[in-house]
Amino acid sequence: MKNATFYLLDNDTTVDGLSAVEQLVCEIAAERWRSGKRVLIACEDEKQAYRLDEALWARPAESFVPHNLAGEGPRGGAPVEIAWPQKRSSSRRDILISLRTSFADFATAFTEVVDFVPYEDSLKQLARERYKAYRVAGFNLNTATWK
C-alpha cells in the first residue's frame, strides 16, 4: 500500500534563510536516512535545492546527512538526493519528500511520500489539492506533526 503523510506546520518562522517547511525537510531526511532509507527531496526550483544542499552541509558533524544534488555525487547517488523539475536522476529511492506546490506525477513511483501543509493560508489550499490528488492516485493518507 502506498502511504502519503502530510506534516501540519504551526508556524512560518524562517531560520538561517530556511522556511519552516525547509527546516522540517532537513530533519525528516536525516531521520529517514538514519533508519536506512534512500530519500529523494523534490524541490520546487533549483534555488530551493541549493538552499537545502547548503543547510544539510552546515549540520554539525554528528548529525551529518550524506546527500548530493541530482546528477552529482557517487554513482547511484548519495542516500539523500536533492532534485528540482529540470534536474532529477533515475536512481531508485525509497521515500519522496515533496516540496512541490502541485502534485508531482512521479510520486506514484514511490510507496512512501512526505508532503506538507504550510502555515500560510494561500499555501494550505494547494496542499488540499495535492491531498486530493494523492487520494485519487490510491495513496493511504495520514497527517502528522513533528515532535
Curated annotation (Swiss-Prot):
E.C. number(s) listed in UniProt: 2.7.7.7
Matches recorded under SUPFAM superfamilies: DNA polymerase III chi subunit (SSF102400)
Entry protein name: DNA polymerase III subunit chi
Gene: holC
Molecular function GO labels: DNA binding; DNA-directed DNA polymerase activity
Consequence of gene loss (knockout): Knockout mutants are sensitive to high levels of chain-terminating nucleoside analog 3' azidothymidine (AZT).
Cytoplasm recorded as keyword: no
InterPro entries: DNA_pol3_chi, PolIII_chi_sf
Matching PANTHER family: DNA POLYMERASE III SUBUNIT CHI (PTHR38767:SF1)
Pfam families listed in its UniProt record: DNA_pol3_chi
